[in-house]
């Protein structure tokens, strides 16, 4: 059994003896960077050496200096520089700068090497103050190339996010006096040992831990199997990633104060109740209600919707909030679905919640799959990472399905049952049913999302075993979705997103063809959905009522500008609307506050009767899709202020209108009076909401 620490020690001893035999030009110093400088050298590592010489011409005979190293069959990367040239490297390239910070004396003029390193450190501290963003951008580019160590089935132990390079970056930030150095020695040691043994078993320098090498590495390190090793590596990488995230946040907090920018252009804009945008960072209001159990969801939903970062102090304070009661309030469930509805931001927000111990409050099953290595070789990510990638894929299609909230919930839970001795589809279906119950979903919705998770592999099995054009294939699929059109459409989207998130070669032309054919034929068998007009009881002209924690504006009249202007002036968001046209409009608008305003019926009535408020904002452009059910137009678009009114202003005469919010998607159905042109209506709607 190989001892990685002993291997590094023996290799370093051998190399230092070799370097000590070199005859250096007078007045020069031989210094090391890279793995030798950090005492991380393996038998297959490159030697990174710098010959430092005083200002002036390069000493004679330098070319002959390196032959003993080459004769010893060592891989060498060398340079010859003056102290000024070494210092200049700090500004030239942040990757090279990190290497220069490790500069270690090997032989020759030790004082020359020490003075050079002191100047390098001083220059690094200056550079961080001036070009901190460039250092971060270099790290981000590296993460994009290599992926996160915590989430990959073939993790890059050195360059991946949470890997050895990130540990070095934390040390560099601490050396720049921008953060404290966290205690990560054990995590660093595990990654270093694993990489050392990877070199030994691969018989070459390598950073990606493939499964075939992971078996031997796990055995050498005393793990039961490679899956246990994978979990420990993921935990170590997660700790390093958390440490770096904290270090970067601390550094950002220090640097603006040094330059004076922190006190310029200070602005605070409300995003939701007790949630504000403070100069591009999401923070809590000045006096937030930390006894509100739904506050963490509102903060996370705002982050997912806007893409803004959440202040580290805000995440910490949210841990003071109590757990949600069951079933969840309707607004809390809506915020949860908003968190999952952003293709770009959902993954980042969920990971931040998880890093601060908040995600498992709402998804207690998550901890079981965190860092779990899949058994299938087709997977390139851990189960939790794959699940979030599937959610992101489904979030791209939220306007193409009738129930985007159930779609993203099913995507989140579709593989959460893995790691049990029973079929993961069955276990996951049971888990998502319990989750849907906690969220307060009705029986029909619970049944739909439970079926979605239980049958999420159905199409792949049909494609592998049956002709997708056959009646038998259609029968099998309809049986799987319980002859439910909504579930069928959700399954089609989830199947594609799941395959694309699994790995290369899973989403094939054959699977795509089978999916499209069998789903289309199954849809043709089912009856189209027939939208139903809303039920609205007769009432007086204006009122504000509360039912089960939902506030509803009741209105009867002709001037939509007037009622909607008051709602928008008070900073309320319309989450649902029910409208009937019978000479005049009879309508109900479900609303929620974006701030601490009271839902005072008397104040609302006074504002309405004043007639002062009639301005309705023009909505920002967003993704929009249209569908027809006879004379009823269904519009699905991103939830945003003013979207409902923009649509009403565009549509021809309508008999009734029904609008609901599903996650971050607004779904509006409008039954139009006969005599309209479909193409004209569609163009007008898309132009007003999507701009094209």
UniProtKB/Swiss-Prot annotation:
GO MF annotation terms: [protein-PII] uridylyltransferase activity; hydrolase activity
PROSITE patterns reported in the protein's UniProt record: HD
KW Nucleus (keyword) present: no
Activity control mechanisms: Uridylyltransferase (UTase) activity is inhibited by glutamine, while glutamine activates uridylyl-removing (UR) activity.
UniProt region (Uridylyl-removing), positions on chain: 271-692
InterPro entries: HD/PDEase_dom, HD_domain, NT_sf, Polymerase_NTP_transf_dom, UTase/UR
Record keyword Metal-binding present: no
Domain called HD: residue spans: 383-484
Cofactor: Mg(2+)
Keyword annotations of the record: Hydrolase, Magnesium, Multifunctional enzyme, Nucleotidyltransferase, Transferase
CDD domains in the record: HDc, NT_GlnE_GlnD_like
Coiled coil: none
Region (Uridylyltransferase): 1-270
Catalytic activity annotation: [protein-PII]-L-tyrosine + UTP = [protein-PII]-uridylyl-L-tyrosine + diphosphate; [protein-PII]-uridylyl-L-tyrosine + H2O = [protein-PII]-L-tyrosine + UMP + H(+)
Family indicated by similarity: Belongs to the GlnD family.
UniProt comment concerning the protein's domains: Has two distinct domains: an N-terminal nucleotidyltransferase (NT) domain responsible for UTase activity, and a HD domain that encodes UR activity. Lacks the two C-terminal ACT domains found in GlnD orthologs, that seem to have a role in glutamine sensing.
Function, as annotated: Modifies, by uridylylation and deuridylylation, the PII regulatory proteins (GlnB and homologs), in response to the nitrogen status of the cell that GlnD senses through the glutamine level. Under low glutamine levels, catalyzes the conversion of the PII proteins and UTP to PII-UMP and PPi, while under higher glutamine levels, GlnD hydrolyzes PII-UMP to PII and UMP (deuridylylation). Thus, controls uridylylation state and activity of the PII proteins, and plays an important role in the regulation of nitrogen assimilation and metabolism.
Record-given protein name: Bifunctional uridylyltransferase/uridylyl-removing enzyme
Organism: Corynebacterium glutamicum (strain ATCC 13032 / DSM 20300 / JCM 1318 / BCRC 11384 / CCUG 27702 / LMG 3730 / NBRC 12168 / NCIMB 10025 / NRRL B-2784 / 534)
Gene designation: glnD
